[in-house]
Structures are given as structure tokens and as C-alpha cells.
Amino acid sequence: MTSLFFFVLLFSSLLISNGDANPNYKEALSKSLLFFQGQRSGPLPRGQQISWRASSGLSDGSAAHVDLTGGYYDAGDNVKFNLPMAFTTTMLSWSALEYGKRMGPELENARVNIRWATDYLLKCARATPGKLYVGVGDPNVDHKCWERPEDMDTPRTVYSVSASNPGSDVAAETAAALAAASMVFRKVDSKYSRLLLATAKDVMQFAIQYQGAYSDSLSSSVCPFYCSYSGYKDELMWGASWLLRATNNPYYANFIKSLGGGDQPDIFSWDNKYAGAYVLLSRRALLNKDSNFEQYKQAAENFICKILPDSPSSSTQYTQGGLMYKLPQSNLQYVTSITFLLTTYAKYMKATKHTFNCGSSVIVPNALISLSKRQVDYILGDNPIKMSYMVGFSSNFPKRIHHRASSLPSHALRSQSLGCNGGFQSFYTQNPNPNILTGAIVGGPNQNDGYPDQRDDYSHAEPATYINAAFVGPLAYFAAGRST
């Protein structure tokens, strides 16, 4: 008991909120899901709520004589990168699976967002036998322009992987997304669920049979934007873990075992999936009491010990205001992803009355929940500069985000094309963006808790789908009134 009290005392100052009341988590949850409408590519439906967006990318895939319309633009540009898009989809699906009962009416909005992605991913997987399409748009040209997706005139180059040009990382992540989504739709659309799962199995087999990194196959088309820096074995473990959860087929358990133990990371992101796989597999050890997965439970707890402040093995920095700080570029992507894992592992711990040790300190579920809550509250405005890093949440939020469509006149107000360079006049102005991308979470503050709110500062001012996707689960947890 002494070690537990000492551990809690040591980092209690980090967990104490500076605010007098909790943020409105239900509002934040709703807006975090609404954000995805602003990232849509393809023909927009009548129910589109973010009305300053219009249909775009309607010829995507035509360069390869296939239909690759739909999906999401990853961040503030007009390119569809499937590796982060599939990860976004997996995390949205995991959120719905773990926290759907706590989402209330927002669960249907989550399903809509998931399906917008999976409809596109199904096209990518099924359009051409022996190929998996993994992206649309030339990032090197796109990033030289500042134009709306509705009238972009940059090349819509199509990228794919195959047996001769493998991409196990993007293939296994696509399989993970489809498998996870198949469980989301199992009870509400069984036919669609079966299609998702059947396709997930095929794509996962492709990833296993033809191993290699998509960065090697596609080089400058995906690097340095979304290089697979961690390699592809983490995605193989992650993808197989999701197929195992969706099917309970021992084939996937045996394949996971054949991969070995994997790395011991202190991060979780669209690139490095090991920590996510460990937490997902630890579910079987804890909830199903399956001793075959004990090593992954231990790996998950080793990861958490690297995150918790004042843990003997902690390798995570925190700002003075209490925010996890991993890397300078888009730090909040790591904060939201890690926070999801903390909240979810705490959920498993509570269900089984489980505790574990970081050195001599006994870790209880509420230690993880308290740290998660501190990160969520910080993002929503409980921080030294009282800035909400979610656009449109509270009165003080980023006004000049690095996002083409948000920063330029809407297509409804100015239908004439701006051209590749026509938007830079808006880019360089200090005026707030004319279109509010409600719910978008930007890259976040610097290590000193500061945020300059400059449009050209993409490291801090650019939103991304995967930042939001991982935030949905923790928001749903706290929106349901779970503060401990």
C-alpha cells in the first residue's frame, strides 16, 4: 500500500485539473465525429452538414481505369493516403466496439464515418485482382499548391502494391480496418459485415504471402509523407490480431506467435502499431483468461509503464501544463492514440479486477483513467493558455489551421477555380479561416505549452483524421460519466 500511495502522490500534481468543471464531453464527442465530413472525398450526400464543402475527386481512379472515388483526405491537403486512412478506420471501429454503448446517438454517426472509409477501401481491395490500391493524388505536386479539393487540377495519380511490388504494412492495416469494421456492422448490416470480413481475410493473406514495405515499392510517392518507418511486422501483428478477434480462427493466433515478441515501444501511431496490438491481444489474456496471450499482456503493461509519469521505466516527457510530449510534429496524434490505449486497458483491468506493477509501484485502473482524463481535458482547453485544440469547441480555439478547404472561400460562395497558386493569397494572410472545420483537432502546442496559431506552421496547426479517430473512444468514455 505504501508504494501505491507514494506513486499516486508523486504524479498527483500532473493529474489535477486547473478548471472548475469538466468540459462538455458529449459536445466534444459529437464535434469530433462531425469533423470527418470536412475530410470527405467523392460525391457528397444530401445530409452533408459541413455545407461549405462540395463534391470532389470525382474522377479518382480513372488513371487506372477503376473507380476509387470516396474515402478521406488525410489532413490539410487533397491527397488520399491509404495507410493513415486505414488506421483512422481501425481506430474509429475500435472506438465503436469498445465504447459504442456509451455513445448514444453518436454511434450511428461513427458508423457513417466508418462506412465512408470502408466503402472506399473495399474498392481499393476488389477493383483489380492481384492488386491493392493504396492512394490517389501526387503528394509532391499537391503540396506545391494551395487549392480547394473541389477544383484541384493536380494529377490524381493512382498507387498500388502487388506481388512484385509488395506492401505488407498498408495491406495488413487495410485488413485490420475491414476486419474491425465488420464487427461494427455485424448486427446492423450482416451482408455488408460479411463482405468486409471476407475482403479482410483476402487482403491479410496478400500481406502475409507477399512481404515487404510499401515505402520500398512506392518510394517518393509516400515518403517522407507516410513512410513505414517502423517496418511492416507491426502491421502484420496488428492485422492478424484484428482478424483473430473477428474470426477466432487459430490460424491467426499461430501466425502472431510466429512473428515473435516484437518491439517494446513507448509510442502508438499510424506508423507503429505494436502497442495497439499488445493491448488488443491482452484482452484475450484478461477477459478470456487465455494464458497463450500472457506475453502480450506483459508487453502492454511494459508499454504503459513507459507512459506513466514517475514510473521507474517511464520514457515519456510531459509539459509543465501536464500534456504528454512525444515528438514536435503533430504531437497530439500520439497523445490521443496513447490515451485511447490507456482508457481501454483500464477498462479491461476494471472488468477483471486486475492490477500490475511498474517497479515497486502498484498500478490500479484509476491511475490510467486519471492520466487519460488529464490529456482529454488539456486538449479541450484545460491548459496554461486556455486554448481548446478542437476547432469550434469553446470560444478560444485555433483560427488559422493549416487546411486548404477551411482557409479558402467556399465553393458555394466562389465557384470559379482558384488554380494551383491562387489560394496562396489566403494562405499568407493573418485573417482567420473563413470556414470553421468543426471538431478538427490540430497538431497541438509546443513543448512549452505555447501555440502560435499560424497557418504555415503545419507541425502544430494541421488537423488529421487519425488524431480525431483515436480521441473518439476516450471522449465516449468520459461523456458517459466515467471520470474514474
Swiss-Prot record:
Catalytic activity reported: Endohydrolysis of (1->4)-beta-D-glucosidic linkages in cellulose, lichenin and cereal beta-D-glucans
Enzyme Commission code: 3.2.1.4
Protein name: Endoglucanase 9
Tissues in which the UniProt entry reports expression: Specifically expressed in root cap cells.
Primary localization: secreted
First and last residue of the signal peptide: 1-21
Entry's Gene Ontology BP terms: cell wall organization; cellulose catabolic process
Annotated family: Belongs to the glycosyl hydrolase 9 (cellulase E) family.
Taxonomic path: Eukaryota, Viridiplantae, Streptophyta, Embryophyta, Tracheophyta
Location in the cell: Secreted, Cell wall
GO MF terms, alphabetically ordered: cellulase activity
Enzyme class: hydrolase
Residues annotated as the enzyme's active site: 77, 402, 453, 462
Keywords noted in UniProt: Carbohydrate metabolism, Cell wall, Cell wall biogenesis/degradation, Cellulose degradation, Glycosidase, Hydrolase, Polysaccharide degradation, Secreted, Signal
